[in-house]
């Protein structure tokens, strides 16, 4: 059944992309089939999404990060592996791999009108990105450019995607600890679909202990052919350094 909609496949998977704004900040993605343009139908959806990232150093300037999260409304598990490499003081290069699986029930919730899908959908992604981070007074500015190769099942063709994101963060002293509020905007481009997705994301990174941080955040996503999604994200970041 899913192959009927394969030519409309455009991602809508909560992708855990780790972004360096002084402290780790996790963002996301959910890949799902899109129906043809529908201007009427079901409205936006709220998706509570817990996640966990564990980071450990491999050697000086190179880390290994394992992230997992669950998009409750769509019943989607996601796993991502990142290997950030600190190339210069301001530039980090990160190769990464992401896997997600969407059940048929999740596919039917993502679009303005139910797809009638009876099969699940899975996708593998290999990505490479470069993130430039620099300070302006106490603000931390970041700009990330990412290339994603999407390997999709069934009749859907493998395709490439560009993702561009700009972000800002600012440390804030609270009760003897340094909290870090942040905000970012990201856009997505694919050769056939053009600029087909936007994300606005905001939250705060809160240190709990030296090796543990808590990050509540909110992300709004608009994508071509899918319902708008309001992600309510609750994450834990564990650093073994």
Region roles according to the model:
Residues 58-66, 89-95, 137-141, 174-179, ...:
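Repeated loop/turn-to-beta-strand initiation elements of outer-membrane beta-barrel proteins
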Residues 1-7:
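N-terminal secretory signal peptides that target proteins for export/translocation
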Residues 57-61, 142-184, 238:
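Detector for outer-membrane/organellar transmembrane beta-barrel domains
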Residues 52-56, 81-85, 128-134, 147, ...:
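Residues on the lipid-exposed face of transmembrane beta-strands in outer-membrane beta-barrel proteins
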Residues 40-48, 67-78, 122, 151-160, ...:
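Solvent-exposed loop/turn segments connecting transmembrane beta-strands
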Residues 10-21:
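Bacterial N-terminal signal peptides
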Residues 75-76, 92-157, 184, 215-239:
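Outer-membrane beta-barrel translocator/channel fold
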Residues 25-82, 241:
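Short glycine/proline- and aromatic-enriched beta-strand/turn motifs that initiate or cap beta-hairpins
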């Amino acid at each position: 059944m899913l192959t009927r909609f394969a030519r409309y496949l455009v991602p809508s998977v909560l992708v855990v992309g780790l972004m360096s704004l002084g402290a780790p900040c996790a963002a996301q993605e959910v890949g799902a089939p899109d129906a043809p343009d529908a201007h009427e139908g079901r409205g936006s959806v709220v998706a509570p999404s817990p996640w966990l990232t564990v980071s450990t150093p491999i050697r000086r300037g190179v880390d290994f990060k394992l992230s997992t999260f669950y998009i409750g409304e769509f019943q989607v598990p996601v796993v991502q592996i990142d290997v950030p490499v600190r190339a210069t003081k301001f530039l980090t290069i990160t190769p990464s791999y992401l896997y997600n699986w969407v059940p048929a029930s999740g596919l039917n919730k993502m679009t303005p009108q139910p797809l009638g899908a009876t099969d699940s959908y899975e996708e593998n992604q290999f990505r490479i990105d470069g993130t430039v981070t620099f300070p302006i007074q106490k603000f931390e500015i970041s700009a990330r450019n990412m290339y994603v190769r999407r390997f999709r099942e069934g009749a859907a063709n493998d395709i490439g995607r560009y993702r561009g994101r700009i972000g800002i963060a600012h440390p804030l002293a609270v009760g003897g600890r340094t909290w870090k509020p942040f905000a970012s905007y990201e856009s997505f481009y694919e050769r056939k679909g053009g600029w087909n997705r936007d994300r606005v994301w905001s939250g705060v990174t809160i240190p709990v202990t030296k090796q543990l941080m808590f990050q509540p955040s909110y992300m709004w996503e608009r994508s071509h052919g899918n319902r708008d999604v309001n992600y309510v994200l609750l994450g834990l970041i564990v650093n073994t350094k």
